[in-house]
């Protein structure tokens, strides 16, 4: 975790303002000093006393409050990060125009730190050309603007415009503090296909052969790609409990065969393929139609057949000209050492065998790789370059992976 930082949470006046309470609480519990700056409209949804209780700091709303302390300048100057959640269409427009007609917009003008906007508004507002232009302008100036989530909105409306989940906002806030700068918007125009989670190969209607992959690392990669401008499709295997990344097209699958078919369908349009899913190498040759019962008829062995190698298949398809748009293929390897060699020995062999451009390597062990929120490993390149991925959150590791993908694409452009 980053050292204690000073974070300003700006709250604009939308129905999602109540969700800012969770953002404030999570950032405060992470050890940061949080100052809440709501607009007057926001206080119609959540009272100042609530924000003061959650943050432990006084709440100021007006430019003319405590004038002798020059709050309209001081709050922004002292901030290490500004988070606007929710950011309404009106707030985005005023930020682009450089307005300073309340304490929040004045704070934005004086801040010299990363700024993160988490939009929330009706679908029509989000898709309006004015808002689209405003978001593009803010991103061009260096701000990070999340894509809103899709789902139920105010009243009976449904569609893109929901405030991203608090966990997504606070995770990205933490990442920005760790990086101490804004995320680049360097994947704009890139179509990325990401796989995540683990496949399950059924034995009968109840049982299956599976693995321990939670999907957290693949979800983090998809989320960072989207935040940096990519058009992302995420193929997720058995990832119940994970929050779908905002602004990402989701495809849910169960088995390795289903994952293969989904990749085959979406890969022709993709420029980047990130195979973070843990795909079963084998599946039962026969699937029982009914639950296998204990007793005389229970099997003494299970015959297995090999699943198609999805990663190697994508590499072959590109070489055969079937994926003309594909510029980068990234594989993942969860390895253990054995009598024949250590983790990197097996990873290098896999990179050569698969033929992908980059390979992310994780050493499997207790509290490592699977079912945890932090990770480490190595990144191997087909040109022989190897770099360590230092221990950190899976979001931070995803950022380093996307950094490497961006650098690889740039190297292709000459």
From Swiss-Prot:
Gene3D superfamilies: CoaB-like, Flavin prenyltransferase-like. Its cofactor is Mg(2+); FMN. GO terms for molecular function: FMN binding; metal ion binding; phosphopantothenate--cysteine ligase activity; phosphopantothenoylcysteine decarboxylase activity. Pfam families: DFP, Flavoprotein. It catalyses: N-[(R)-4-phosphopantothenoyl]-L-cysteine + H(+) = (R)-4'-phosphopantetheine + CO2; (R)-4'-phosphopantothenate + L-cysteine + CTP = N-[(R)-4-phosphopantothenoyl]-L-cysteine + CMP + diphosphate + H(+). In the N-terminal section; belongs to the HFCD (homo-oligomeric flavin containing Cys decarboxylase) superfamily. In the C-terminal section; belongs to the PPC synthetase family. This is Coenzyme A biosynthesis bifunctional protein CoaBC. It comes from Mycolicibacterium smegmatis (strain ATCC 700084 / mc(2)155). The gene is coaBC.
